[in-house]
Each structure stands twice: as structure tokens, then as C-alpha cells.
């Protein structure tokens, strides 16, 4: 989860796609986006056994209705306090892991912004 959907798209295009292209093993697992039924888009990378879904903390739609065992929240200090009147995006993302109980993993990282107020 990036701070915005636009940042998620940029991260996908500038980091994730080149990573897949440069790794023979990943290239073999992730079907190219140009393949019609690949399941590979800018914000979703499907591979055997799972998928990588990217979204923004500014999108309530992107933070609901999808169980996730692993959630990586990046630059959380840039997240809005409330998203679309549905609450804290950090809490919304964490709710996606409820299905997995003690097997869930949340990775929360950020560049600190304001001393004493950073998440």
C-alpha cells in the first residue's frame, strides 16, 4: 500500500516491472501484461500460488474486500488520517489480514516526518 494510487502505479512501473524483467525466475512466473489473460496489470501481478496487488492509501475501494496474508504498508506518514469517510487506511489494510489470524504479517515502514507524531 503506497500513499496514493498514483504512487502505487509509479512504483509498479519503475520498480516492480523492471525487477520482473531482469530476473529470469520471476519472468518465468509472472506472465507478461501483453498476454490477454495474464492477470498482470499495472496494479496486479499474478503468479502461481498468489498475486501482488498494489493500491493507494487514498482509495477505500483498494483497501477492502480482499483477504491478504501479507500486507506491506510503505511511507505510512504520508497516508491520510481518513480515506473516503471509511476510517484510517492503516486500520483498513490491517483488517484485510483478519482471515489469517496469527499467520498474518504486516510490514509497516516510513520515512519519519514530524518528531513525536510519526506513525
Language-model segments: residues:
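Phosphate/NTP-binding elements of NTP-utilizing enzymes
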Residues: 1-119
